[in-house]
């Protein structure tokens, strides 16, 4: 009888742990209105889109991000810096409301073409609870191709708690003779000073 009791207790502990995990990660049967597999208040880097899809082969760069957070706005921007001076700031697309609400969904983006160093357009879509905001942005012709020694990086951030107002880089480019490689400071105010030109596509949560 004691052995049976221990087995029952063990089963209860295992089931309880499994249910707590499912709840924490927003899996079924909990929180059907949230993005599955992502804890509350966090962002998930889903990296590049599935390259087995023939259509994705037409993209020079692409990515996907998942999120569950209380907030009012999800925005994707395109910025250009000359050293540490921002010379261009453009909104690509956004999804938002007048007050804080549950923001749960994904954003996908892509750069049509075959050369990530010669982009002409950015396409992005933000999905939230069945609604989608999508748009395209034509990149000005004088930004790329005029400076040598360019480098590029796709979604260099890690999964974790979302910090409101932080720039989560989707795609970044550095250009100039001073090109010293990429590190955690490359796409920061400190890193901008080391490059002749820096271009970033990023998402911000508010």
Residue ranges: model-predicted function:
Residues 4, 49-51, 62-63, 157, ...:
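Short secondary-structure boundary micro-motifs
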Residues 91-206:
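Extracytoplasmic electrostatic interaction patches
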Residues 19-102:
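N-terminal export/targeting and maturation segments
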Residues 1-15, 19-20:
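N-terminal Sec-pathway targeting helices
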């Amino acid at each position: 009888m004691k052995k049976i009791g221990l087995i029952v207790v063990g089963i209860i502990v295992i089931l309880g742990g499994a249910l707590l995990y499912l709840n924490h990660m927003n899996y079924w049967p909990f929180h059907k209105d949230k993005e599955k597999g992502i804890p509350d208040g966090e962002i998930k880097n889903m990296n590049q889109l599935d390259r087995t899809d023939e259509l994705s082969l037409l993209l020079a760069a692409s990515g996907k991000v998942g999120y569950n957070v209380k907030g009012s706005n999800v925005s994707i921007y395109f910025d250009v810096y000359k050293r540490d001076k921002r010379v261009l700031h453009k909104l690509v697309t956004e999804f938002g409301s007048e007050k804080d609400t549950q923001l749960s969904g994904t954003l996908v983006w892509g750069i049509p073409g075959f050369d990530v160093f010669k982009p002409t357009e950015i396409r992005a879509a933000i999905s939230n609870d069945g609604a989608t905001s999508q748009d395209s942005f034509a990149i000005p012709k004088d930004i790329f191709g005029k400076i040598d020694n360019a480098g590029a990086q796709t979604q260099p951030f890690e999964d974790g708690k979302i910090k409101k107002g932080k720039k989560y880089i989707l795609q970044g480019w550095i250009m100039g003779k001073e090109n010293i490689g990429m590190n955690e400071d490359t796409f920061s105010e400190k890193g901008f000073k080391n490059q002749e030109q820096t271009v970033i596509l990023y998402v911000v949560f508010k």
